[in-house]
């Protein structure tokens, strides 16, 4: 029995990893080849009214540029409305919005700090647009990115349209370049899922939903961008990813900042998955349940499964001592993660260290996320992720590449 448990602990992360990052993407890719490509609706004679929603907490440094680029997009000026929800900001965020000098830019201040989901809930009664475009305070929207997002929503049966993140940063100084590889893989997988039928989570940086779906309140500890796709599906709509609707997302400059961000976002994501567990029923939700299990559940189960490589070989020390190489590898990886977390800010990590360091920091973040879930912690409030103020990329075109 000891050996059986040991081998089970060792093989579990292998099986989950191969399925989540190999088998599942391959199945979805093959499945997508059997479906016609998702086609945007033609440009309408009259574009619908949009509310661009930004929930911000102490974003005085970056918010003005984000609003500037949002208002400069290729879209009729009289059809744009920007609503900034301040989560009881204590810096100059509120004054910046009040003094912006454009009647299309409005401020809704939360009297007490409750977090981004609470701000999104509060915005429901204040939106003016037929569609609500949610963006982060730190991202920039290229000029030609908004119309493709709207054209996707004009396709009958589509309730949510998600943009395509382009991860950008200071190539010479940052310590987290490996993040861009993961983001690229994630966006490609969403493109396959769109062709099959529906994505299971939107990009929190840039997505749009029908006003009636956005107005539905959600528990304040959930991740709305993840939950929004399931809300759309449960109301008979599909959620799609739009390749031409790009947004420029500055990478977190250090793996230390990435650890904080990932543990928080994954913790909220796990709580959201528990809340949405009914969506995993294949008899009711069909392909959506399959993709939810493959894209989200399998990935997030992988993190606690990695603990098996610390314990399993110890149970097999007599019958299969060679498996201790896995324990040694995990310990070495955790030491590497510790090294990357103490790397001086502003100095670029060597390529030999950056990618494995990112992987092991992500594993630690996953463990912390599960710990948050098991302890019943509800991660509603947040601190702005320390991203670069300036992006070394042009926002004039969506053709930028990570």
Task: Cite the ranges covered by each PLM segment.
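Short, acidic, metal-binding catalytic loop of nucleotide-sugar glycosyltransferases
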Residues: 68-79
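Catalytic donor/gating beta->alpha subdomain of glycosyltransferases that bind UDP-sugars
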Residues: 102, 153-186, 219-224, 228-293, ...
